[in-house]
Amino acid sequence: LDQKGFTANNFAEFHPSGTLGLRLRKIKDIMKKDDAIPFIYPHTSVKEILTKMTSYSVRGAAGVIDANKDLIGIITDGDIRRFLEKNDQPFKSVAEDIMTKDPKTIDANAPVEKALSLMEKNKIQVLIVLDQESATPKKPVGMVVYQDLLSTK
């Protein structure tokens, strides 16, 4: 490909439905965004967390943001299950008691292949998407779910 000046990115652009084309697409082209994804604050109650995590297109995860809307954590259904097993009064807790701090993230301009690799390596189902080229690189712009990426394999 490179001998003729035809790059992998050109291939992805001209063959977007092919296996290689799908794997080379950018995260921003397939991520869930805006009203499809739940975000909560550190002091959100467990009851509200559960409601949000089941009310959005992205189910089973919620990003945790601070007052500036910067990402500070994530709560997944696995985090909730582990928390419930250890606590006899879980409904007195809030998001910051449950969340995974410094969650794995991916840049909006990264290829799908990188997200698949990161998720498989870390055994996670959801990545929060950041736009690291923006003026606010810690503000989440979307989420990508492993199940959605399986169609790119």
Explain the meaning of each model-derived region:
Residues 73-78, 141-149:
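Short hydrophobic beta-strand motif reused across regulatory alpha/beta modules
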Residues 30-69, 76:
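Oxyanion-binding "anion nests"
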Residues 30, 53, 69, 98, ...:
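Terminal peptide-recognition signature
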Residues 37, 71-72, 81, 135, ...:
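Short hydrophobic beta-strand segments in globular cytosolic domains
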Residues 23-37, 92-103:
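Bateman (tandem CBS) regulatory domains
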Residues 61-110, 114-117:
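Helical hairpin unit composed of two closely spaced alpha helices linked by a short loop
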Residues 40-58, 84-87, 105-133, 143, ...:
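The conserved cystathionine-beta-synthase
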Residues 2-32:
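Internal, active-site/partner-interface "lid" segment
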